[in-house]
Regions:
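Long, domain-scale functional regions
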Residues: 2-12, 26, 30, 34-391
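Short, hydrophobic beta-strand segments
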Residues: 22-23
C-alpha cells in the first residue's frame, strides 16, 4: 500500500505461541511509511510434544490509517516474552558468584557477600546474601530490598519501612497467640488453615481460612499497592508454605515435624516447594490459586540464603528489616505441631529459629514480600543513594 499504514505480525500453526522480545528494535504493532522497513525480534515456542510448523505473516491495514486486516486463522502477536532470570540480572548490571555457600555458617563467618544461584520451581534463581549494598529498590513510594530474582525472571522484594517511615508499621505486628490460635490441630499449621478434626492430610491442610499473618499482609497490600495504583507492576509468584512432613502424619493432633524445621537444623535450605497445595499463588498455573492478593512473607529458607543461621548475627541485609529492639518477624515456614500447639519459625536478634520455646514469647512482624515484573525497573544502580526505580 502507498502512504502510511498500520502494521502488525500474525502467526498460525498448531501448538504455537509467538511473542516479541523486550529488546526488539521496532514495536510489534504501529505504522510504517511506504518503502520503509521495521525490524521485530520474535520468540516462537512449540507448546506441544511433536514437531509443528509456524507460519508468520506481515499484517497491514488499508491506506490512510485503516484498521489491520487479519486473515482467518491468524493471531496477532501482542505479548512480550518475559525476561529470563539471567537476562534480568544482566539488565540490572549485576553479576553472580558460582560458589555455593556453607549455610551452617553466617555470611559474616564465611565471608559470603554477594549474589549466588540456586534452583527454584521455575528455573535458576539469583539470591542476595550478606551485607550487600546493591539491592535497594524504590517502588510505590516505599523502600524495598531485593531478596532474589525468581526463576521465571520476576523480582522478589521485601518491604523496608525504615528509610521512608523511620519506624515499623504497627499494623503488621502479629501476636504469637493470634498467629497460632486456636493451635489445637495440625489444621492450623500454615498461611491458610484447613479443617480441624479431619482424618486425611488433604482436608487438614485444605487452605480454607486465612491466618492472621495473611490477613495482615493482605490488608497492607490493598492499602499501599492496590489503592495507590501500582498493582499492574506486581507479578504472580510462588510463596511457599511448606507443610511437607519428615516425621508424623500432619493430621489431627498427631505430633508432627515439618520439613522447614528439619532444613533449619541441618542447614540445607531450598527454594523449591514440593507440594502444589503449599505454593501460594493467585493463579492456578504456578500454584494453588488461593491468594486473592499477590503478596506473601519471607520463608525460613530465604532467610538462611540471605546469611542467617541459628546464631545471632547482624551482618546481613535482612537484619534491620526483620528485627528491632523489641520484636522479630514471622516467616512463612511451619516447624511442628507439638504438645498440642502449632509452631512456625521466626527471626529474632538476627537469628532464624526453629525452636517453639523462643518464637512464641513475643509478638512479631509480618513483613510483606512481593514480586514485580522483570522489566519493571527502568533506572538506578541499586545503591541506597541511587536505588533501582520503578516508574
Amino acid at each position: 500500500n502507498n502512504g502510511t499504514v498500520k502494521y502488525g505480525v500474525g502467526y498460525s500453526g498448531s501448538n504455537i505461541t509467538v511473542k516479541y522480545y523486550h529488546d526488539t528494535q521496532d514495536p510489534v504493532t504501529g505504522t510504517v511509511d511506504y518503502g520503509k522497513s521495521k525490524f521485530i525480534k520474535l520468540y516462537i515456542q512449540n507448546t506441544g510434544s511433536t514437531a509443528t510448523t509456524a507460519t508468520l505473516s506481515t499484517i497491514l491495514g488499508y491506506e490512510k490509517g485503516g484498521d489491520l486486516i487479519v486473515p482467518s486463522g491468524y493471531t496477532l502477536v501482542n505479548e512480550k516474552k518475559a525476561l529470563s532470570s539471567k537476562e534480568v540480572l544482566q539488565r540490572l548490571g549485576l553479576s553472580y558468584s558460582k560458589e555455593t555457600p556453607n549455610f551452617s555458617l553466617t555470611s559474616a563467618e564465611n565471608g559470603t557477600n554477594g549474589i549466588y544461584a540456586a534452583e527454584d520451581d521455575l528455573g535458576t534463581s539469583y539470591y542476595f546474601r550478606g551485607n550487600v549494598t546493591n539491592n535497594y529498590v524504590n517502588f510505590a513510594g516505599k523502600a524495598w530490598r531485593i531478596i532474589r530474582i525468581n526463576g521465571d525472571g520476576t523480582i522478589r522484594m521485601i518491604y523496608d519501612s525504615l528509610p521512608t517511615e523511620g519506624r515499623r508499621d504497627s499494623t503488621l505486628l502479629v501476636n504469637s497467640s493470634d498467629f497460632t490460635a486456636p493451635m489445637n490441630d495440625n489444621a492450623y499449621v500454615g498461611y491458610m488453615y484447613g479443617t480441624a478434626g479431619s482424618s486425611t492430610y488433604e482436608s487438614t491442610h485444605s487452605n480454607s481460612t486465612n491466618s492472621p499473618i495473611k490477613n495482615a499482609v493482605d490488608q497492607w497490600y490493598d492499602k499501599n499497592i492496590v489503592n495507590t495504583g501500582y498493582e499492574d507492576y506486581v507479578a504472580d509468584a510462588i510463596y511457599c508454605n511448606d507443610r511437607s512432613v519428615y516425621e508424623g502424619t500432619g493430621i489431627g493432633t498427631a505430633e508432627t515435624g515439618y520439613m522447614p524445621g528439619n532444613r533449619l537444623l541441618s542447614s540445607t535450605p531450598t527454594l523449591k516447594c514440593v507440594n502444589k497445595n503449599d505454593r501460594f499463588t493467585k493463579s492456578t498455573t504456578l500454584g494453588n490459586g488461593k491468594l486473592t492478593k499477590k503478596v506473601g512473607v519471607v520463608t525460613s529458607d530465604e532467610v538462611m540464603y540471605a546469611g542467617a543461621t541459628s546464631s545471632e548475627s547482624n551482618a546481613y541485609y535482612l537484619y534491620e528489616i526483620l528485627n528491632d529492639s523489641s520484636n522479630g518477624s514471622w516467616t512463612m515456614s511451619p516447624i511442628a505441631f507439638s504438645n498440642g500447639g502449632v509452631y512456625s519459625s521466626c527471626v529474632l536478634n538476627g537469628a532464624i529459629y526453629a525452636s517453639p520455646d523462643i518464637c512464641y514469647f513475643t509478638s512479631n512482624y509480618a513483613v510483606p514480600v512481593i514480586s514485580i515484573k522483570g522489566d519493571a525497573i527502568i533506572s538506578g544502580t541499586g545503591t541506597s543513594n541511587n536505588p533501582f526505580k520503578v516508574e
